[in-house]
A protein has these predicted regions:
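Adenine-nucleotide phosphate-binding core of ATP-dependent small-molecule kinases
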Residues: 177-227, 262
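Short glycine-rich, Thr/Ser-proximal phosphate-binding strand/loop in the N-terminal lobe
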Residues: 3-44
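Conserved phosphate-binding/catalytic loops in two-lobed NTP-binding clefts
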Residues: 81-88, 245-267
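Short beta-strand-loop/turn "lid" adjacent to the catalytic site in phosphate-handling enzymes
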Residues: 23, 32-35, 51-87, 118-125
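Glycine-rich phosphate-binding loop plus the immediately following alpha-helix
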Residues: 122-176
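Conserved phosphate-binding catalytic cores of ATP/NTP-utilizing and phosphoryl-transfer enzymes
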Residues: 2, 73, 79-107, 112-122, ...
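Glycine-rich phosphate-binding/hydrolytic loop that grips phosphoryl groups
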Residues: 93-98, 136-140, 255-276
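Glycine-rich phosphate-binding loops at beta-strand->alpha-helix junctions
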Residues: 65-72, 218-247, 262
Length: 276
């Protein structure tokens, strides 16, 4: 029987709650629960985590909570010491731990987007954007009548951006040394009557990821490292990888999506207590 106690990190986000346990150097099966009510999703996630990992309440030493929903929690969970941790710190700790880096620009892509600069133990919030998962679902709901992210991803699979976006090659015959001809000159700047549902779905995903990736590249310019670590729910969208790879041809950055990236903030919450 493992007697080392577990530190639990819970990230109560805008649309989902993520939970993860850390015992020594081991990450215990992370889980995600969808819920609109922060308290319901907190206890739902915690109960599921305890049950599916066959844990007892006594095996848990402390619980770290973070995320926008943590403001609704004002007492300990099942009499276990419960500590609120600032979300930006969690993003930094989690991003560095999952990527194995000592310093990086960490981008948390959830309902909106937050960017921190992390160097060893120093975490600095540098900004963000309201463009994120909420933008993606809001626009896809209005433009395509699609309200589920999985359906949007599936619809976008065969999408052709050249029916939606204006590319550099569409407006310039000259080769620009710092701008590949396939780069976007204007998102949705060339939308044609021939654009299919798939094309528009891909255009929306591309718009959101290009905006986030470009902002991250600018934020990283004043950093000592060119590495950008992506965490949060949006990292699970397959097209994220492709869009960021294309941005690497324009900017001097390396975009990294580590394993368990969607749980980065929850991991950071648990680590913030362990570091103490």
């Amino acid at each position: 029987v493992n007697t080392v106690k577990i530190t639990v990190g819970i990230d109560i986000g805008g649309s989902t709650t993520k939970i993860i346990g850390i015992r020594g150097d081991e990450i215990i099966t992370p889980m995600i629960v969808k819920a609109n009510d922060p308290i319901a999703s907190l206890f739902g996630a915690f109960g599921k985590f305890i049950d599916q990992n066959a844990l007892s309440l006594g095996s848990i030493e402390r619980i770290a909570i973070t995320g926008v929903g943590s403001s609704h929690v004002d007492k300990s969970i099942y009499d276990i010491e419960t500590i609120k941790v600032q979300e930006f710190l969690c993003n930094g700790y989690g991003g560095l731990h999952l990527s194995g880096l000592k310093s990086a620009t960490i981008v948390s892509m959830g309902t909106g987007t937050a960017i921190v600069r992390a160097c060893n133990g120093d975490i600095e919030h540098v900004g963000g954007t309201g463009v994120g998962g909420g933008t993606l679902l809001g626009l896809s709901n209005r433009m395509l009548n699609i309200r589920e992210i999985d359906l949007l991803i599936e619809t976008a699979k065969d999408g052709d951006l050249s029916n939606v976006d204006l590319l550099v090659s569409d407006i310039s015959r000259d080769v620009l040394p710092t701008l590949p001809s396939k780069s976007t000159a204007s998102n949705f700047g060339k939308i044609s009557d021939l654009a299919s549902k798939s094309d528009i779905a891909m255009g929306l995903i591309n718009l959101v990821f290009e905006t986030i990736g470009t902002l991250a590249a600018f934020a990283a310019r004043s950093s000592s490292t060119n590495k950008i670590v992506l965490i949060g729910n949006l990292t699970t969208i397959p097209q994220c990888h492709d869009v960021m790879r294309a941005l690497e041809a324009i900017y001097p950055n390396e975009f990294i999506i580590p394993d368990h990236a969607e749980f980065g903030t929850a991991v950071g919450a648990a680590l913030s207590l362990i570091k103490k």
